[in-house]
Amino acid sequence: NCKIPYIVFTIIIINIFFMDKNFFKITRVLDGGMGQELLSRGMKPKGTLWSATALLNDNYHNLLLNAHLDYIKAGAEVIVTNTFATRRIRLIENKVEDKFEYLNTKAGEIAKKTKDDYPNILIAGGLPPQNSTYKADDRSEDIIKDDFYNQAKLINPYIDFFYFDVLSSIKEINVATQSIEEFNKPYLIGVHISEGTELPSGEKISELLNKLKNKKLLGVILSCVSP
């Protein structure tokens, strides 16, 4: 598992919508990993749902909210919705696909509640790989796009920008960014580097940077680096 903290450094800055366009021109701090944090606070995970257990079990809702708040108190300027494990495929694996809408919506609601006390905090809508983590998604583009869109539309009302978390190929990134076009929000891309300067797909990060041209792009970060 990748356990590096989410410290943001910007590689590309273009234009920003609905946010201060200079926000990522300096180093910023995002919150840390949520799964391990919730475990340390007493959450008992269900199957492979990991951090999504805190959404499925309403006894853990305050635990999740307090984790968000404590990251803010520790200096986080951006928090990420607890949606890494609420992708449809993970819910299917755990026989709770019928909770897809509820879990993603609840994650957005809990994240947004932090603005009651911290109105200036930014909320990133976390959109994880829609198939396996740390591997390039070789499914059809239409299927990948639908999966990203269906999760994005549920968290869209609660967020300031989208954050694509640990994507593994240029194809996946292109499809993911296309999936959110109708929401007209900026986005940050988090990539997984597996071999030096390469994505798990074998493509170099320089290839990705040369192809990224979108006025809603906030930047690119290395959200996970394999040893």
Where do the model's predicted regions map?
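Generic detector of N-terminal low-structure segments
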Residues: 11-14, 19
